Regions:
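Short amphipathic alpha-helices in soluble, non-transmembrane regions
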Residues: 292-298, 342-350
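Conserved beta/loop motifs at nucleotide-recognition and modification sites
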Residues: 64, 302, 307, 355, ...
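Generic C-terminus detector
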Residues: 337, 345, 349-369
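Short, low-order "capping/linker" segments at domain edges
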Residues: 320-333, 366-369
Length: 369
């Protein structure tokens, strides 16, 4: 059940016990800032390496989940965990090819930072490790381990997805490395350890729903450990151990997460506490798109004269160009959903009577999920 559904109905249906009444996995949170200070520069923490070694000795299996969902090139400090955020929207800034850091909500931009403004460290940058690199690291640290990798590259061929899962289920591998596709609904009775690498990756995306999505992914991942008769353990590796999405997922506490997340959404004016209208504008002509966005925003500001609303942007919606078509987005925030509908209707009429928008595609999305 999504956070918005719970908010609207004020009803929470909880399933606190597993289907076969197994004990929940024991969850350990590892602060990767301390790992760095202790001289460990590996993506595998000392605790995770020790637990993986135990599994290999017991002939039990391990799943390593690299949390890259929604990854958008955010910049963080490995010394203190500080993430460079937009000063106006409380979402992370994304690094673009021109070296600038931009907010995909309001369009704010700044030059890329090389020194952490919080602690002064030069250990600041983008997270670059992928599943292939993780696989190589595991093989180096544990030469005796049989390792399978499951990601977009290894599942392109027909039936490859099923073959990898079948091989792991048949215990033809000791370790399965993968992205979010390995954590959803799979039951492997011999998996007693799950390692969640870079739990922060989905937490600091340029999306106000990043906390909710992180909580969902981490709780799903933790739930893969100990599905059989053996006790399960999970290790969450993070640079932000005190963030509520990390702490509550480690505790498997949805109620505590919900309370913190709703507080954040209310403070920032994001759904479901308030309503959001996303206006997506696209065109093959970049200059025309820029001009159209400017006129459209100016009109929307005038059109909301009797409506209590904020018009934000235009900004880049994550991916700026798809199939040679350029994209922008304008956001409108207001407490009253009906006001959004009124403003949307007025804007549509304005677009219809202005031929300058004929070579642009304009879409409206209420409270985008």
């Amino acid at each position: 059940r999504g956070l918005g559904d719970v908010y609207k109905r004020q009803v929470l249906m909880e399933m606190k016990n597993r289907s076969k009444m197994q004990d929940p996995a024991e969850v350990y949170t590892v602060d990767m800032r301390k790992e760095l200070k202790n001289g460990n520069r590996s993506i595998l923490s000392e605790q995770l390496q020790r637990l993986m070694k135990e599994r290999l000795e017991k002939k039990e299996q391990t799943m390593l989940f690299l949390n890259r969902r929604g990854y958008s090139g955010f910049v963080s400090c490995r010394e203190c965990g500080h993430v460079i955020k937009c000063p106006h929207c409380d979402v992370s800034l994304s690094v673009h090819r021109d070296g600038k850091m931009r907010c995909h909500y309001c369009g704010y931009e700044q030059t890329r930072v090389k020194i952490c403004p919080e602690c002064g460290s030069d250990h600041i940058g983008e997270f670059r490790a992928g599943t292939q690199q993780i696989e190589e690291i595991v093989k180096t640290v544990f030469p005796q381990a049989r390792v399978l990798r499951m990601d977009m590259d290894t599942t392109r061929q027909k039936d490859s997805h099923e073959k990898i899962l079948s091989a792991f289920a048949n215990e033809e591998a000791d370790v399965l490395v993968g992205t979010q596709m390995i954590v959803k609904g799979h039951d492997f009775p011999n998996v007693t350890l799950v390692g969640i690498l870079a739990a922060d990756m989905s937490l600091y995306t340029d999306d106000y729903r990043s906390g909710e999505r992180t909580f969902q992914l981490l709780t799903q991942a933790v739930g893969r450990a100990g599905r059989g008769d053996k006790k399960g353990e999970a290790v969450i590796q993070t640079y932000s151990p005190d963030h509520y999405a990390i702490a509550t997922s480690a505790a498997q506490d949805y109620e505590a997460f919900y309370e913190e997340e709703i507080r954040y959404r209310t403070m920032m004016g994001y759904p479901p506490a308030e309503n959001l209208l996303a206006v997506f504008i696209s065109s093959a002509d970049e200059a025309l798109l820029e001009t159209g966005c400017r006129y459209l925003k100016e009109y929307m500001i005038k059109a909301k004269k009797d409506i209590e609303a904020s018009v934000i942007g235009p900004a880049s919606p994550g991916i700026e160009k798809i199939n040679d078509v350029y994209r922008k987005v304008i956001y409108v925030k207001t407490a009253d959903y009906h006001d959004l509908v009124v403003l949307k209707d007025r804007t549509e009429k304005y677009i219809e009577i202005n031929s300058g928008f004929d070579k642009m595609r304009i879409q409206f999305d209420f409270n985008p999920m």
